[in-house]
C-alpha cells in the first residue's frame, strides 16, 4: 500500500512536467568502477529527456525503496551502489510497516546528508514534492 500511495502521489505531481516516474518494472543501470549492474528500485524518477533505453534508466534523479526494518543489507548495499550515480539527487527509504512509519531521505549536497521523518511533512527537493508520512500509510 505504501508503494502504491507514493507512486500515485508522485505521478500526479509530475504529470505534464519534464520528469517521469516509474514503478518497480524499470531497472536502473549503475556503473561502479567499470562494473555494470542493474537494480530494480520500487520507484525511480528521471528528468533526462535524452534517456535512450526502453528497459532501463541511466540518469535517475530520485530513487525510492520500500523496505522492511529487517532489510539492513538492502539499505547498506543499495545506498553504497547508488552513490555512484552522478545524476542521483535523492535516495529515499520508506518503511513498509504502518506501525513504525519512517521516511529516510538521503540528499546529495556536495556530500550525502540524511534526514528521517516519522510524522508530519517531508519534501523531495529533487522534484519539488511535499507529502505527509501519514498519507503514505493511509
Report residues per predicted region.
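Gly/Pro/Ser/Thr-rich low-complexity, intrinsically disordered segments predominantly at protein N-termini
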Residues: 1-138
